[in-house]
Amino acid sequence: MLNYNHNQIEKKWQDYWDENKTFKTNDNLGQKKFYALDMFPYPSGAGLHVGHPEGYTATDIISRYKRMQGYNVLHPMGWDAFGLPAEQYALDTGNDPREFTKKNIQTFKRQIKELGFSYDWDREVNTTDPEYYKWTQWIFIQLYNKGLAYVDEVAVNWCPALGTVLSNEEVIDGVSERGGHPVYRKPMKQWVLKITEYADQLLADLDDLDWPESLKDMQRNWIGRSEGAKVSFDVDNTEGKVEVFTTRPDTIYGASFLVLSPEHALVNSITTDEYKEKVKAYQTEASKKSDLERTDLAKDKSGVFTGAYATNPLSGEKVQIWIADYVLSTYGTGAIMAVPAHDDRDYEFAKKFDLPIIEVIEGGNVEEAAYTGEGKHINSGELDGLENEAAITKAIQLLEQKGAGEKKVNYKLRDWLFSRQRYWGEPIPVIHWEDGTMTTVPEEELPLLLPETDEIKPSGTGESPLANIDSFVNVVDEKTGMKGRRETNTMPQWAGSCWYYLRYIDPKNENMLADPEKLKHWLPVDLYIGGVEHAVLHLLYARFWHKVLYDLAIVPTKEPFQKLFNQGMILGEGNEKMSKSKGNVINPDDIVQSHGADTLRLYEMFMGPLDAAIAWSEKGLDGSRRFLDRVWRLMVNEDGTLSSKIVTTNNKSLDKVYNQTVKKVTEDFETLGFNTAISQLMVFINECYKVDEVYKPYIEGFVKMLAPIAPHIGEELWSKLGHEESITYQPWPTYDEALLVDDEVEIVVQVNGKLRAKIKIAKDTSKEEMQEIALSNDNVKASIEGKDIMKVIAVPQKLVNIVAK
C-alpha cells in the first residue's frame, strides 16, 4: 500500500512558506479584511501540549479559507511572557528569567511552525520586549492622567515565611501553595485601576457582541449590577454612621441588627472596652481566611458583638452592631443590615446568637425558617399592606425625606488591583518624591527598563525584589535636586495581554501605539478563539482598556472582539483532564513525528464539535491518518505521478456529490462546524473510489477544501495537479444550485397494492411513459400474467399502481 511521507512533505512546504513569506499580511487598506486572533500563549517550560493546537487550527482554517475568498487576512502570533512561573524558576535556580523565557519561546515557536499554521511571523510580539512594554507603560500613563489609576490601601495575602505577597490563587486553606506557610491578610499600598467607572458600558455593550451567551452571562454576573438603596444608621454615643447597601430597603423595619466586616474602618472606634479583646482575637482569625472560605454558605456562622448600638432610621429601634467574617470589606460598603426573618444567612446568624427576628412580609412561618418569597408588608409603619415593588419605592422616599438614605446602583465588580510585588513584570512608570508628590515618568523616557540583576529574591518587606536594587529605586530631579524613589511594584501579567491585538496591527511603529489608519482598517477582531478559562478576567480587562482607548480617540471601535469562540478541552484517553501527575499528557511533537502535522490538525477538528470536551483516542488519530492516505492513493501513483483516473472530461457521475460537498464545507466553515465539513469530504472521497474516472476540476476543488485543514498535503497535491504556485491564494470553489439535486428519481410499482418493482427514471418522465416503463418490467409482467388490467394510476416522480383481475 502506498502511503505518503509526511516528514518529507511537511518540511518541504514549511520551508517554502518561510522562504516565500507566503503568509505576509500587506496593509491594503481598501481590500475587504478579516482579523483572526488566537489567545497568545504563556511560553511555559513544558512546551506546547495537544490542547493548544485545537484553537490554533480552527483560526488557521478560517484564515486560509478567507484568503481564498479574497480577504486581506491578519493572522498573527506572539508571547504573553511575563508572569509568575518564570519568576519562580529564577528564585529557585538563580537564573535570569529572560534566559528561561527566551529558551521557552524558541521551543514554542519551533513546535508551532511544525504544525503549519499560517502566521505572519513578521508581526510577532513579546510582552517582555522593552519596545513592546514601552506602550504598556504608555497606556498606564494615559489611565493615570485620566484619573483611572490611583493608590489605595488594600488587604493582600502576606506570607512572612516567603517574604512576599501572594495572589489569591497561590493561597490554599490559609497557607501558601508553595511550602505550606501561614498567610495573613495585611493592608498595603497598591495601585488600583478604576474599572468600576466603566461597569455600565461593559455590561450594556455585551448585547452587541457575537459571543456565546453563557460567556456573556459569566461577565454579567462578575460585574453583578444590582439596584437598591444606600441606608445610614447612626451609631449611638458617637458621631459615626454605618452605611449599608441593600437591594431590599422595603424590609428595613425588620432590620434587627447590623453586621460589619472585621476590617471595617469603624470597628475599632465603636467597640466598647468590655468587648475589645474578643473583637481583636476575632479580627486576627479572620485575617487568615480567604474570601472564598469566609463566604462559604455551608460553613458554620461565627461572629462577635462589639458592644455598640445603632438606631434604625425608620423604626427608631436600637439595634446591636456585630462583626462577622461572612461580610467582606470589599463588597458594597463592608456592612449589612440584617433582616433575619427574610434572609437565610441572617436567620442562621440570629438563631445562633439569639438576636431578634421581626417578620415584615407575610406568607411564611418565621418560627421555622426565613421567608424569602413575595407578600404584603406587615409591622412596617407606612409600608403596611404594600407589595414588594411599591414598598421599595416608598421606603426609599421615606429614607430620603429623613436624610437617611437614597436610591443607589451597586456592583459586585471591584476596582482592579493592578500592582504585584514581583520582579518579572512591567515596571510601573511612577516616581514618589520626598515632598509627598508623585509624577509619572516623562513619555519621552519610556520604556522604563526592568533592571537586570544577578539576584532575584523577595525583599522581605512585602515590596517587590526591585526594592533591593538601589540604582533603580533612587532618583534625583536634575532641575530641582529633589530626591525620589521609583515605584517598585510591577504590573500584573494581565497588562500585556490587554492590548496585544492592537500591536499586531502595527508592531514596528516606534512613534505611536499603532497607526490610526491601520487601526481603522483592521478593527474589530473578526474572530477570537481561546479557552473558556479566560472568560472573565482577561476579556473584561481587555474590553476595559479598549473602552478607555476609545474615549481617548486612539481606537475607532467601542469593542475589541466582535466574535468570540471557546474551544473545548481535550481530555486524556480515560476522559480525565491531561496532567503531568497522571502521566497522560500527549506531546504534539511525537504525533507530528509519527502521524504528521496534517493528521494531528485533521484529527483535532474531526474529534467532535469545536466547543465540546472530548477524550483523546489513538484509534481516532489512526483513522484520520488513513483518510489522508486514501486521498493520496486516489490521486498519486506508486511512482509519484498523477493517477490516470483523473481526467479532463466530465461524465457527470460526481456532479451531485461534488456540488453538495462545496456547499456543505462552505457553510460548515462559516459556523466553525469543522467535524461535519470533514465528514462531507470523506463522503466525496468514498464516491470517487466508486467510479472509474474523476473529473479534474472536481479534484482540484476538493484539494482546495482540504488544504485549510491539512495544508501540507494540500500544497503537495496541488503541485502534483500541475500548478506552479501555492494553493494559498487560489479562489475558493463555488457550487451550482441546479446540480445539488438528482436528474433521476426512484419510483415504486405496485400491482394490486403490493410492491413489485423499484425503477430509476428521469425526473421529467410523463405519466404515459411511466406506465410503459412499468408494464415492460419483468417482475411486473410476471405478476399480471393471465390477468385483465382494469386501470393504471401514475403519480409523477412517485409511483405507478396497476389494478389487475
UniProtKB/Swiss-Prot annotation:
A motif ('HIGH' region) lies at residues 41-52. One of its GO terms (cellular component) is cytosol. A motif ('KMSKS' region) lies at residues 577-581. Disulfide bonds: none annotated. It comes from Staphylococcus aureus (strain NCTC 8325 / PS 47). Keywords: Aminoacyl-tRNA synthetase, ATP-binding, Cytoplasm, Ligase, Nucleotide-binding, Protein biosynthesis. NCBIfam families: leuS_bact (TIGR00396). Pfam families: Anticodon_1, tRNA-synt_1, tRNA-synt_1_2, tRNA-synt_1g. This is Leucine--tRNA ligase. GO terms for molecular function: aminoacyl-tRNA deacylase activity; ATP binding; leucine-tRNA ligase activity. The keyword Signal does not apply. ATP binds at residue 580. Belongs to the class-I aminoacyl-tRNA synthetase family. It is found in: Cytoplasm. The gene is leuS. It comes from the Bacteria. One of its GO terms (biological process) is leucyl-tRNA aminoacylation. The keyword ATP-binding applies. Its EC number is 6.1.1.4. It catalyses: tRNA(Leu) + L-leucine + ATP = L-leucyl-tRNA(Leu) + AMP + diphosphate.
